[in-house]
Amino acid sequence: MLLCRHEKPGKEYWLLPGGGVNTGESLVDALHRELWEELGIGEEVAVEGPVAIVDSISPVQSFAAKHVVHIIFAGDLGGRSLEAVNSQDAAVRGHSLFGLDDLDDVVLHPPIQRFVQRWRPGDPAVYLGALWAR
């Protein structure tokens, strides 16, 4: 599983590559753009999905509270090497490919480890509900 490392003061966590969708952009086009911006992967990646949808709703109700909808795709990097990856996104501090058995020890936002470990190609898309990682 390909993840991007992020940091906040005193806290390291991992996210799926991704971000917002620009006006007029399809979800798959946004996915390819984000792979380029965050990981320098310029070629189109074969994708399946969406495979899951997750809400991340901030438990703190305020003007700055967040509600992020994650639309998760599966993809195949086709044997691409990630050694020379250079992110254009200043928030991305690194990246790594994780084996499914290694995800239990990863601070992942949203916390979708169990879903990913159970998911198989061809499974129907699922709504995982509201998941918030602190």
Where do the language-model regions lie?
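N-terminal strand-loop-strand
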Residues: 1-16, 28, 43-44, 77
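Nudix hydrolase/Nudix homology domain
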Residues: 11-14, 87-134
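Unchanged
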Residues: 21-46, 54-108
